[in-house]
Amino acid sequence: MSKKKLKNYDPTNLLSDIEKWPNPMFDKKHGYYLYVEGRARSNQTRKEHIVEYGHDLKVRDLELLPDGITNYFEYKKDPTYKNTYNYYLKRKGEDKGFVKVSIRINDKDPTYAWIKTVFITYKIK
């Protein structure tokens, strides 16, 4: 599987750069479609809506993401995986949780990154 690169990755501009992500990362008509690296796990407790896309790619359709998030987000280094960082985008409404976007930074060129996973969660780790 070829990885979809986020060229000139800048962690401070995630929200403003989101439309520049490779298609079909962003689709203005249908909302956000975000790649998951390899085969995604289905976990019903996360209340994910998962759809198929392409060969062995899984795509998660976060139907409320385009107008369902606030400008608030937290950015943390993943405690488990090397060169992986997590964004927690706050969803609108009380107790709606976060959209967690895990991004893997290229070891050799840190200006390149790719999406590993995207899902809805209620805890920041």
Residue ranges and their predicted role:
Residues 1-125:
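Ribonuclease/tRNase effector modules and their secretory precursors
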